[in-house]
Amino acid sequence: MTAPWRIIAVGRMRGSEEEALFQRYAARLRPALTVTEIAEARGSTAEIRRRETSALLAALPPACIVVAMDLGGRAHDSEALATLARRWREQPLPVCFMIGGAEGLEQPVLDRADHVLSLGPMTWPHLLVRPLLAEQLYRAQAIATNHPYHRTGRPSG
């Protein structure tokens, strides 16, 4: 059986449009994608970073594949992400995607990561990263199963 996938993210999405969009894709994923939400810290920028970093690292299971979502990470096209996702599925460990808050991820989280991925060079609100990631993981699953959701190449126009 494939180990579960998990998002560990700063911020609460309760009842938001972002949550509805996230659920739309997360519900289609196999293995299931679960979310652990970390409360957004308050205080100075340094204090926020320290507290959120500590909480994110504390939420990790002892053994897992850690994927940090960070602007400075490597951006993959959908086919390359599908290849990575297939490799992760072949492992007996759960995959944990780490998403920081408005201040991003600090170096200790990036150092703990096995992979650092980016959704591209643009900056995204941290609450939008979850639905974007869920959609890309669903797309990777569609590529792996030859589902028509993903259309290879660019549309002609």
UniProtKB/Swiss-Prot annotation:
Entry keyword annotation includes Oxidoreductase: no
Kindly give the Pfam families that the UniProt entry links to this protein.
Answer: SPOUT_MTase
Q: Which GO terms fall under molecular function for this chain's record?
A: rRNA (pseudouridine-N3-)-methyltransferase activity
- The record's principal subcellular location, in a coarse class, is cytoplasm
Q: Which GO terms describe its cellular component?
A: cytoplasm
What is this enzyme's EC? 2.1.1.177
Superkingdom of source? Bacteria
Query: What family is this protein classified in?
Result: Belongs to the RNA methyltransferase RlmH family.
- Annotated function: Specifically methylates the pseudouridine at position 1915 (m3Psi1915) in 23S rRNA.
Against HAMAP family, the record matches this protein to: 23SrRNA_methyltr_H (MF_00658)
Q: Report the protein name in the record.
A: Ribosomal RNA large subunit methyltransferase H
Encoding gene, per UniProt annotation: rlmH
